[in-house]
Structure formats: structure tokens, C-alpha cells
Amino acid sequence: MAYEIVYESESKRYRSDCASVLTKTCEILKSKNIIAQFSLVGSGAKNLITRNGNGPYDLDYNLVVIKADERYRKDLRLLKDTVRNALNKAERKDFFSDAMDSRSCLTTLLHFNDSPNVEFSFDVAILTKNRNGNYMRLIHNKNAFCFGYDQYTWNEVPKSHDVKEKADAIKAEGLWQEARDR
């Protein structure tokens, strides 16, 4: 099978559904003293979504924690579980399955017609910013041996501060395609 582009007319509904679920998730988190905002990233943000033939495709989102009570900052497992539970609660009336905890994100699947086949999924990475302005991604090291199993850590995304401003400057100079080709 060859990869094909998913047309905007098809992906628009899923983007809308995901935005609705993530808006509800942020409202639930706010009631638990976690202020967060989400953004579509990756191929979905660029309208370049692909899939293998008629197979499923996914969208990727970042959920940036702007402010949270100290208990969440000290207990990253609690933070990820709270986000996962809020996501599950927000999607209860939809067709999505409960979010699954993977290493660097929460994954939610969509099934149709009581079929085991996955039609669509979306991934939510949990991030925050450090003092340098770089993003930090919440990682669940399920098999980390050095500090025991089930370690939760923040992993810095290098040179991630002011990413939008950097991209805008490259585009303004007419060098965007050259940067993409590298």
C-alpha cells in the first residue's frame, strides 16, 4: 500500500472533535488547579496528514501546563494521571476509548461500528516550560532501572524556546522551503 494524503474535508471533523475534547479537558484541569492550553502540532497543524491506504491516521497535540499546584509539580505521576483522568472524563460522551499511557504521551483511539479496527487516534503530549523558556516533555520511563521502575521525569526539548518566532523569521526571509529540505 502507498501512503496517501488525508484531505482536509475528512480531517476537519476529527480536528474539531479533538479540540472539543481538549477544551473540556482544560476546563476539568482548571477545576483541579492546573492551568493548561493545547495546540495541534505535527502534520495535522500543517494539513499534511498521511495514512497507509485506507488505514487509520492520527493527530498530535501538545498540552502545555502553564501553572499547577505544587503537589503536581512534586508528583509527576499524579500530574499525568490527573490529565489522563480529565481526558477520559471529557471524552465520555464521544466514541473515544480511555486514554492509554505511553512513554511520552497519552493515546486515545476511536473505533466505529463495534469493530476492533482503529479508525482514528490522537496523541496528547504533556509539556511545560523551564526557566530558560525551553519546553519540557513529561516522560514515563516504565523500565528505568537506575531509580526503580515507573520513573516520571521532565525531558528538555533543546532549543525549543521561541520556536514560532524562529519559524516566522525563516519564512519572512523566504527560506522556509530550504529549511524543510535539510
Regions picked out by a protein language model, each given a short descriptive name:
Residues 29-33, 77-132:
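Conserved catalytic core of two-metal-ion nucleotidyltransferases
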Residues 1-40:
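Helical scaffold of the NTase/Pol beta-like nucleotidyltransferase catalytic core
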Residues 48, 66, 78-81, 90, ...:
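Predominantly extracellular/lumenal beta-strand repeat domains
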Residues 68-74, 92-95, 152-161:
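Short C-terminal domain-edge/linker segments immediately following a structured domain
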Residues 102-105, 115-182:
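Right-hand nucleic-acid polymerase module
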Residues 61-66, 86-89, 147-153:
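Glycine-rich loops and low-complexity Gly/Arg-rich segments
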Residues 27-59, 63-73:
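Active-site nucleotide-donor binding segment shared across nucleotidyl transfer reactions
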Residues 8-15, 69-73, 77:
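Short, charged/polar micro-motifs that form catalytic or ligand-binding hotspots
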